Swiss-Prot record:
The active site is at residues 152, 407. The gene is NA. It catalyses: Hydrolysis of alpha-(2->3)-, alpha-(2->6)-, alpha-(2->8)- glycosidic linkages of terminal sialic acid residues in oligosaccharides, glycoproteins, glycolipids, colominic acid and synthetic substrates. This is Neuraminidase. Glycans are attached at residues 51, 54, 63, 68, 71, 87, 147, 202, 403. It comes from Influenza A virus (strain A/Gull/Minnesota/945/1980 H13N6). Inhibited by the neuraminidase inhibitors zanamivir (Relenza) and oseltamivir (Tamiflu). These drugs interfere with the release of progeny virus from infected cells and are effective against all influenza strains. Resistance to neuraminidase inhibitors is quite rare. Residues 1-6 are intravirion.
Length: 471
């Protein structure tokens, strides 16, 4: 074989080996891609949820050569593993005073940041923690659309939630449902949220569960179908919700609707001696749910609805104590009334409020002013639910009477690792119109406190924004 033939032979052999190597590489790449997509498209029903990833990185430097080794461990959990319905078996914790839990300072921050205009706020917890909720007005404090947000009902309102302690903004708020009245609660497996929307004479409710709309409820009295404006409570999957449709200053039609996974299980007309029900603040303990409400028609004493979620039944009455907790209200009388409203007070027909009724361990919240939504205090009133002579044995200032308050309501972190359910409450700190007409908007910040067995001091947790900075 001459030299030219040798060169041609060697070249041909090299080219053949190169082509074979290229084909092997292509086949290997195709096999890897195919296996990747085969795993990635395995049906969800056969694939456990990947709930988290732990990774650790080790760096070793030898003779100026750096090697990085990363170990990745996937934490695998089957769907609904360790997820069960909340069971309200524990009692309330003993409370001797209240410690601060959260304060969002939304109005102060909103002076130079994009903060949502809200009202009717509350807190609600789930197995992962607690979130703040409110009805947004679809605009920010600095936006021109903030003009006119003193009005309660519009097509632009939505129930939003955000991480506890932050101020609500367009960037951190999650829309739960659309509407101008709401409630929301977690049953241990998923969250149910309810929003009312529509015109006054034909409003409707949409019930969401697990992030999807499940049930729709039409108006039954044609007069502002509305609900609690704070969290509902669930027991063994049953979540009762109090709804009212009808006049705010006369007899209205109230119903207790029992839901499971967003679907109606039973509807009850209001029974008992309560004459008017709005904006109930509910909590659960010892397999009973108690709702402390607002009588916007007659009573300066608050109506109480006691619900048995196992039997899906209820009764209603009035808070027996002579300590009146609605606003406006007359002076505290010498005797309370368990079965009828106590009338009197100024022109303001009422405000949302709360109480925890637990025998000797009972606490009531109210504005300090009898006539307006200013200041806020909580009073320990043993046996307030049953004793017409019961009076306060201690109290704690939450907001001093030189500052505005607003709605208040109950909530509990039912998943906290305690031997009892620790009572918590929030106070809405309203700013802007109508009391502060130099700005165009009406909005709020939130302060929240929880019970303590210790005897802690009082402080004023007022909003703290300088309205003059907004001019």
């Amino acid at each position: 074989m001459n030299p030219n033939q040798k060169i041609i032979c060697i070249s041909a052999t090299g080219m053949t080996l190169s082509v074979v190597s290229l084909l092997v590489g292509i086949a290997n790449l195709g096999l890897n891609i195919g296996l990747h997509y085969k795993v990635g498209y395995t049906p969800d029903v056969n694939t456990p949820n990947v709930n988290g990833t732990n990774s650790t990185t080790t760096t070793i430097i030898n003779n100026n050569t750096q090697n990085n080794f990363t170990n990745i461990t996937n934490i695998i959990q089957n769907k609904n593993e360790e997820r069960t319905f909340l069971n309200l078996t524990k009692p309330l914790c003993e409370v001797n005073s209240w410690h601060i839990l959260s304060k969002d300072n939304a109005i102060r921050i909103g002076e130079d940041a994009n903060i949502l205009v809200t009202r009717e706020p509350y807190l609600s917890c789930d197995p992962q923690g607690c979130r703040m909720f409110a009805l947004s007005q679809g605009t920010t404090l600095k936006g021109r659309h903030a003009n006119g947000t003193i009005h309660d009902r519009s097509p632009f309102r939505a129930l939003v939630s955000w991480e506890m302690g932050q101020a609500p903004s367009p960037y951190n708020a999650k829309i739960e449902c659309i509407g101008w009245s709401s409630t929301s609660c977690h049953d241990g497996i998923s969250r149910m949220s309810i929003c009312m929307s529509g015109p006054n004479n034909n409003a409707s409710a949409v019930v969401w569960y697990g992030g999807r709309p499940v049930t729709e409820i039409p108006s039954w009295a044609g007069n502002i179908l509305r609900t609690q404006e704070s969290e509902c409570v669930c027991h063994k999957g049953i979540c009762p919700v109090v709804m009212t449709d009808g006049p705010a200053n006369n007899k209205a039609a109230t119903k207790i609707i029992y839901f499971k996974e967003g679907k109606i299980q039973k509807i009850e007309e209001l029974t008992g001696t309560a004459q008017h029900i709005e904006e109930c603040s509910c909590y659960g303990a010892k397999e009973v749910i108690k709702c402390i409400c607002r009588d916007n028609w007659k009573g300066a004493n608050r109506p109480v609805i006691t619900i048995d979620p196992d039997m899906m039944t209820h009764t209603s009455k009035y808070l027996c104590s002579k300590i009146l907790t609605d606003t406006s209200r007359p002076n505290d009388p010498n005797n309370g009334n368990c079965d009828a409203p106590i009338t009197g007070g100024g022109p303001d027909p009422g405000v949302k409020g709360f109480a925890f009724l637990d025998g000797e361990n009972s606490w009531l919240g109210r504005t300090i002013s009898k006539d307006s939504r200013s200041g806020y205090e909580v009073l320990k009133v043993p046996n307030a639910e049953t004793n017409t002579q019961s009076g306060p044995i201690t109290h704690q200032i939450i907001v001093n009477n030189q500052n505005w308050s607003g709605y208040s309501g109950a909530f509990i972190d039912y998943w906290a690792n305690k031997e009892c359910f620790n009572p918590c409450f929030y106070v809405e700190l309203i700013r802007g119109r109508p009391k502060e007409s130099s700005v165009l908007w009406t909005s709020n910040s939130i302060v929240a406190l929880c019970g303590s067995r210790e005897r802690l001091g009082s402080w004023s947790w007022h909003d703290g924004a300088e309205i003059t900075y907004f001019k």
